[in-house]
Structures are given as C-alpha cells and as structure tokens.
Amino acid sequence: SDDWVNKEAYVQILKTLYELLRGPQTVDLLISNFVYEKQGATRKKIMQYRKCLPKDRIFGWEEVKHMPKGKYLLMHSMIYRTKLLHECNLELPKHTFYVDNLFAFEPLPYVKNLYYLDVNFYRYFIGRDDQSVNEKVMIKRIDQQIRVNKLMVDAYINCKSTNKQLKAYMFSYLDIITTISSIMLIRANTEESLQKKKELLEYIRTENKQVYRKLRHSLFGRVMNLPGRSGRKM
C-alpha cells in the first residue's frame, strides 16, 4: 500500500484511546480526519467533520448533524472497538475489492457511543492508474462493486435501529454507493453493463420497494434521470 499515517496524529490517537479505556463510558467508534494525497497535486483535500460532529467528547447519533453529499465516514477515518466487530459478526467477502465500504457501513447500527478527534491521521494516496478506485479499473471490476452494493442494500434493509440520524446517514451512504455503481455501468457503455444496471435496480426494488422509491428521489434518482445524452455520459 502507498498509504501512511501521520506520526503526531498517531500519538494523539493512542493517548486518546488510552484515556477512553480508563474512563467510565465505552466508546464504540473513534473518528479522525484523513487526507487525500493525490499524485501530482499541490493542494491536499482533507476529509474532516468539524461541522458535523462534536469534538473531544463522547456523543451519540442524536448529536450527529447532516453530512453533505461527498462527506461520509470511510475506513480511513474509523477505529472500531474490536469486541463490537465480533458482536456484529462482521464478515467481509474474500477476494473482493471495495469491501472497505462494508467495513464502514455494516457495524454502524451497533455503534452507540462515538468520539471525534480532530487530527489528520490517515494519508490516503490516490491518482495511480492501477488503483482500484480508478475509473477504468472500477469498470473492469464492476461485478465486485455490485456485490458490495447489494450487501449494503441488505444491511440497510435489515437494520433494526429506529435512530433517525443513524438511518439518515446510512441511507445517504447507500445512495452514494448506488450512484457510483450506476455511473460506472453507464460509463462502460455496453449492452451487458446497462443490463447489469437494470438488474441492480430490480434487486433493490424486489428486496424493498420503499428503499427503491426513496433512492429514485435522491441523488441516485437525479443522476439517473438526467435527460438524453447527458444522463448517458454520466
């Protein structure tokens, strides 16, 4: 991997985890910032959550503010309590790319207490042509993206939590992933890929009509309903 972590932020995270372990409350998820280290770029994009999450204290989902599209929790910003991952029986598909989305999604209903440390910890290197998030590579591996997408649909449908903020965040994340899957299938621009897009939508509609209708009125729906060649080029 070309990724790395910032030493000073790492020390702060270890110190915070140590203090939290000694405290009276159990923290299920520690969140920090990560930085996109793009090859050839002079300016770096920092994924931070200062306007969305309380800082330097334990909080619950009810205090999580709306995250705009493009801002969501990725594996690079999340440290789960190990026992929680065992409790939720998280099992990632083997020999499959893009499972980091499942790691950042499936355990969330089990997370009750969160903590946000505003440090730029993880450095996520992007921009290489052979990376899994490169468009051409994603199109080549689209079946794996679809598999992960369907598992996220299942996880959202099976989520028993009644917490509105949690469900809203999970839907927003699912919306983004479904939009990405559909855009990649359209960009592939083959009969087979367009058929796979239809099959993905049919899967969602069959599993849960309410989720399907909600997606049709979200970012996914707006992108998929762009008129004429504009929509197809997306």
Predicted features along the sequence, with ranges:
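Nucleotide-sugar donor-binding/catalytic module of glycosyltransferases
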Residues: S1-Q144, S161
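Amphipathic, well-ordered alpha-helical segments in soluble domains
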Residues: N120, V148-M152, I177
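C-terminal, non-catalytic tails of nucleotide-sugar-dependent glycosyltransferases
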Residues: Q144-Y169, K209-V211
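Secondary-structure edge/capping motif, primarily at the C-terminal ends of alpha-helices
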Residues: Y156-K160, M184-N189
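Short, charged, amphipathic alpha-helical segments
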Residues: L166-S172, L194-K198
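Amphipathic alpha-helical repeat scaffolds of TPR domains
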Residues: F171-M184
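Membrane-interface aromatic/basic loop that binds lipid-linked glycans or pyrophosphate carriers
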Residues: R187-M234
